Structures are given as C-alpha cells and as structure tokens.
C-alpha cells in the first residue's frame, strides 16, 4: 500500500492563513518546500497542487481552495481523476484532542466533528478509510468556544510547538516511503515538542 495523494486541509484566503484550522495546509506547504515542488493553483482540482516523488513513487500534494466544509469536492476530484483509492490518501488536519507539539498518524475512524473530514468521508462515498495526520492544536476547554478557537491564531509559544510537530511529521512522512508506515508512526508518536 502506498500513499498517492497527500492533502492539507484549510480555509482559503489571507484572513485564515495563520489560523489553527489551517494546520493541515501548513504541513503540505512545508512538504512542498522540503521537496522543492511549489504548489500551483489548478481549477479542475479546486485547490493548489504539486507532484512529488517520494521513495520512487509519484505522489500528488493538494491544498483545497474550497472552504473547509467543502474539502471533499477537491479530494474527490483528484482521487477520481488519478484513480486513487481512499486508503492511498493521507489527509493532514488540525486536531483538538492532541496538544500543540504532538502529531499522530491513524487510518480510518470518524470525523470527530471536523467539518473537513466529514465532507471528505461523504464525497468518497461514505468511506472513512483514508489515513489521517492529526496535528495537535489543543482544546479551548469548552465546546462552545471551539469555533472561535480553531478560527483563531495560536500565540507564538503554541505556534512554535505546532511548527516543530509539523516539521517532525514531514520527516516521518518521507520516512514512511523509505522505511515503512510502522517505523514512521513509531518515530512520530514518540515525538513531543518542548
């Protein structure tokens, strides 16, 4: 099993670029930078895309330009065009249930109230069996404050932790293609930015 599509979830536009909800896009942006493969807007895929080679495999990068709750439109368009199965997709997203400085990989599961994941599951024919990179952003402590929290910018101290976790996640993603998922997961799950 190889990953053929790596997606970073986000809301479009400058006003959202630095918000916690865009952590997935920060990850894909970093990966594109590390692999010297600048993202370019591609209208038919409703997002910014790039093609990279990882471990000898052709992999597409995607940051949708739809709003978060319509992310599935971009993912489904690209998956359908390149005949990519759900289990060949890695979706990077912000995760309330993990603290800043931590990132974890998992396959399948629910959407945990995340509107981007919810739409992707729906547009992939109600198939939740894609890989996720969960990037910890922490939780405001009160579920009524979640919307304001994810659409807010993290303080500098938290941003530093999130950036370090994303950096490690990028290294581990590259490792996945050379050394396998188990090794990459073990390394990433042992990491916690200080």
Swiss-Prot record:
Where is this protein found? Cytoplasm
User: Site Discriminates between blocked and unblocked aminoacyl-tRNA: which residues?
Assistant: 11
For the ligand (tRNA), the binding residues are 16, 67, 69, 115
This entry's Gene Ontology molecular function terms read: peptidyl-tRNA hydrolase activity; tRNA binding
PROSITE patterns for this protein? PEPT_TRNA_HYDROL_1 (PS01195), PEPT_TRNA_HYDROL_2 (PS01196)
GO CC annotation: what is one? Answer: cytoplasm
Active-site residue list:
21 (proton acceptor)
Recorded catalytic reaction(s): these are:
an N-acyl-L-alpha-aminoacyl-tRNA + H2O = an N-acyl-L-amino acid + a tRNA + H(+)
For this UniProt record, the keywords arranged alphabetically read as follows:
Cytoplasm, Hydrolase, RNA-binding, tRNA-binding
GO terms in the biological process aspect are: protein quality control for misfolded or incompletely synthesized proteins; rescue of stalled ribosome
Which InterPro entries does the entry mention? Pept_tRNA_hydro (IPR001328), Pept_tRNA_hydro_CS (IPR018171), Pept_tRNA_hydro_sf (IPR036416)
Which purpose does this protein serve, as stated in its record? Hydrolyzes ribosome-free peptidyl-tRNAs (with 1 or more amino acids incorporated), which drop off the ribosome during protein synthesis, or as a result of ribosome stalling.
The UniProt family comment states: Belongs to the PTH family.
- Provide the assembly information: Monomer.
Name of the protein in its database record: Peptidyl-tRNA hydrolase
* Species per Swiss-Prot/TrEMBL record: Shigella boydii serotype 18 (strain CDC 3083-94 / BS512)
């Amino acid at each position: 099993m190889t990953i053929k599509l790596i997606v970073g979830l986000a809301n479009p536009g400058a006003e959202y670029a630095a918000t916690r909800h865009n952590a997935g896009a920060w990850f894909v942006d970093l990966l594109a930078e590390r692999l010297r493969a600048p993202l370019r807007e591609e209208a038919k895929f409703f997002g910014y895309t790039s093609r990279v080679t990882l471990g000898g495999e052709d992999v597409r990068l995607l940051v949708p330009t739809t709003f978060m709750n319509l992310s599935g439109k971009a993912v489904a368009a690209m998956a359908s065009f390149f005949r990519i199965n759900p289990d060949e997709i890695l979706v990077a997203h912000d995760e309330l249930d993990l603290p800043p400085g931590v990132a974890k990989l998992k396959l399948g599961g629910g959407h945990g109230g995340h509107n981007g994941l919810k739409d992707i599951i729906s547009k992939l024919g109600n198939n939740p069996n894609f890989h996720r990179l969960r990037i910890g952003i922490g939780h405001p402590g009160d579920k009524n404050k979640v919307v304001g929290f994810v659409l807010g910018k993290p303080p500098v101290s938290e941003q530093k932790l999130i950036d370090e976790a994303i950096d490690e996640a990028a290294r581990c993603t590259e490792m996945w293609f050379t050394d396998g998922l188990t090794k990459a997961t073990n390394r990433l799950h042992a990491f916690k930015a200080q």
